[in-house]
């Protein structure tokens, strides 16, 4: 292709102010995307080639495990999502689904995911175990009503995604296919030239028994990954489990009151009372809002030197109670004032606080849901709130508290924790960008949408399901996070918009022009993915743009063209050699083969 006739470049000289991270900056500066509105981007021709190459890699691997490609509607009727009991959670409050009503007043949503639609289709087309297993996939645009779109294509309102859905006759068959998909994902990311790590993950709003995320390690990542150096364990921080450090024993012979004027924080209490944070149980109050409109106060206890993992807490509450949990929020001073909770001792609450403290409130449930992390429930002697302002007290043991607690892991694992009693391996931490997620959904959706099949004995059974997502546009941006320098992008060759860029420095020179045409035609005839920068512009501008857009190899045609010689430049290694034009194709094939093998 030629820049002047079929592939215009839209590079920028200045970095757009809204771009916070380097990959977003380079996508905009390189002319790959154009901002239309907050979180909404146009994919320019050069970006579309990257997307198409990623999509081709994905399709090849999925076709290898007998997945069938289809295209599902983006506009979903609300009744399907109400059957799965996800409509309220996805549309109310801080829900992420764009939703609307048509002129008949019927409700619809713009799809962030397609479990409901594909399950509805499966319920109509799958009748017998003889049709199973089946897997369908699509690559298309998804929508999320992000509260704060940021980081370009990392967190946008509109994005391209591959989502696949599998149907099975048994839990064992689902698990077997899940492993095949996991291997396919590893191949996909390797063939995209990415350095990824698979981690145990929370299933979130999608649900299911097991899930795994695939992360590109990068400083700009929004997710924290905890892992061991040996590679024996890796998990997203939302899912990670570990053992906290040992507490420092508190030496007190009996229960006693401690006056703590204006000492609401753990730091203040420790500094003023010669205590260590591990000797304190902090109590955090949450308000849980359920789909049935009920509001239930949550009393969560954890050791003072640890932090509550709100994802673990949310999932625990959601599993234990019948109605779907929609929202979980920390109760602060403003909430107490708004609810007119008189003399509510926020900041001084202990695990033994009575239900009477909340019975005055008309909208809240009249009793606490009490939850304690293992780090709190295992303490023998500790300090916690005294349930009256400016006072804490010493407790003899958590087990002596005459209240019913749900004991579970609601703690944030962190760097430096040991992974188990049997191992001294400590957790390390790094940042990651999620580019893929696979789930064993089980029968969650088939039960609610009545998707059944007839087994070998003629009995009707619910289908077993899996779902598998890849962020196509995220892969493109994540690849830039891993492959750039001070001059611009340095694409892995597998997903680069072109394999090689020809840069004539002066096309007004007839010798350069003739040699340029010869080289271009030779590469085209050998089916090399080549771009010719035939703009009537200064050589310096072309060189700067070439480094910015990041095509792996450059052929620079200059004054030595009179001797049929050119320069061959590798963008990643920055090596440049002078070479006879007759040897150029052979050189490119050799160098590109090395790069393909290195990145796959």
UniProtKB/Swiss-Prot annotation:
EC number annotated for this UniProt entry: 6.1.1.15
CDD domains: ProRS-INS
Domain remark from Swiss-Prot or TrEMBL: Consists of three domains: the N-terminal catalytic domain, the editing domain and the C-terminal anticodon-binding domain.
Intrachain S-S bonds: none
Localisation per UniProt entry: Cytoplasm
Name of the coding gene: proS
Protein name as annotated: Proline--tRNA ligase
Record key words, sorted: Aminoacyl-tRNA synthetase, ATP-binding, Cytoplasm, Ligase, Nucleotide-binding, Protein biosynthesis
Source organism of this protein record: Prochlorococcus marinus subsp. pastoris (strain CCMP1986 / NIES-2087 / MED4)
């Amino acid at each position: 292709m030629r820049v002047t006739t079929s592939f215009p470049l839209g590079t920028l000289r200045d970095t757009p102010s809204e771009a916070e991270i380097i990959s977003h900056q380079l996508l905009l500066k390189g002319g790959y995307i154009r901002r239309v509105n907050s979180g909404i981007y146009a994919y320019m021709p050069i970006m579309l080639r990257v997307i198409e190459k990623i999509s081709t890699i994905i399709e090849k691997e999925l076709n290898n495990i007998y997945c069938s490609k289809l295209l599902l509607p983006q506009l979903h009727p609300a009744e399907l999502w109400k059957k799965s009991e996800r409509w309220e959670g996805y549309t109310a409050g801080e829900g992420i689904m764009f939703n609307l009503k048509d002129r008949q007043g019927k409700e619809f949503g713009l799809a962030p995911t397609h479990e409901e639609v594909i399950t509805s289709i499966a319920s109509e087309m799958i009748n017998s175990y003889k049709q199973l297993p089946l897997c369908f996939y699509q690559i298309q645009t998804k929508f999320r009503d992000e509260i704060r779109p940021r980081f370009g294509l990392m967190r946008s309102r509109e994005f391209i995604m591959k989502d696949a859905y599998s149907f099975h006759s048994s839990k064992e068959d689902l698990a077997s296919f899940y492993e095949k998909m996991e291997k396919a994902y590893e191949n996909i990311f390797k063939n995209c030239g990415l350095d990824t790590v698979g981690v145990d993950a929370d299933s979130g709003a999608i649900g299911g028994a097991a899930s795994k995320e695939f992360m590109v390690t990068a400083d700009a990542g929004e997710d924290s990954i905890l892992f061991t150096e040996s590679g024996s364990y890796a998990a997203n921080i939302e899912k990670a489990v570990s053992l906290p450090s040992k507490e420092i024993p508190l030496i007190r012979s009996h229960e006693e009151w401690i006056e703590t004027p204006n000492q609401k924080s753990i730091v203040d209490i420790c500094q003023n009372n010669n205590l260590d944070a591990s000797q304190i149980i902090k109590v955090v109050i949450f308000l849980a809002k359920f789909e049935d409109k009920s509001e239930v106060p949550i009393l969560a206890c954890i050791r003072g030197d640890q932090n509550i993992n709100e994802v673990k807490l949310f999932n625990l509450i959601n599993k234990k109670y019948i109605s779907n949990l929609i929202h979980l929020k920390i109760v602060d001073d403003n909430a107490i004032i708004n609810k007119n909770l008189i003399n509510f001792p926020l900041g001084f609450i202990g695990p033994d606080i009575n239900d009477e403290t909340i019975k005055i409130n008309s909208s809240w449930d009249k009793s606490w849901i009490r939850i304690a992390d293992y780090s709190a429930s295992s303490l023998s002697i500790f300090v916690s709130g005294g349930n009256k302002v400016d006072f804490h007290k010493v407790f003899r043991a958590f087990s002596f508290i005459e209240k019913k607690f749900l004991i579970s892991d609601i703690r944030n694992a962190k760097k430096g924790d040991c992974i188990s009693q049997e191992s001294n391996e400590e957790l390390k931490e790094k940042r990651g960008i999620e580019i893929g997620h696979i789930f064993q959904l089980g029968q969650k959706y088939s039960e609610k949408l009545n998707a059944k099949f007839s087994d070998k004995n003629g009995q009707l059974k619910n289908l077993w399901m899996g779902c598998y997502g890849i962020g196509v546009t995220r892969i493109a941006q994540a690849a830039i996070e891993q492959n750039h320098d001070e001059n611009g992008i340095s694409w892995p060759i597998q997903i680069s918009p072109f394999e090689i860029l020809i840069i004539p420095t002066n096309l007004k020179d007839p010798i350069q022009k003739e040699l340029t045409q010869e080289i271009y035609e030779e590469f085209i005839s050998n089916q090399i993915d080549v771009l010719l920068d035939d703009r009537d512009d200064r050589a310096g501008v072309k060189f700067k743009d070439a480094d910015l857009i990041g095509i792996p190899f450059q052929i620079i045609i200059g004054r030595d063209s009179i001797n049929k010689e050119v320069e061959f430049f590798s963008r990643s290694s920055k090596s440049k050699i002078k070479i006879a034009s007759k040897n150029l194709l052979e050189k490119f094939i050799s160098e590109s083969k090395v790069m393909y093998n290195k990145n796959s």
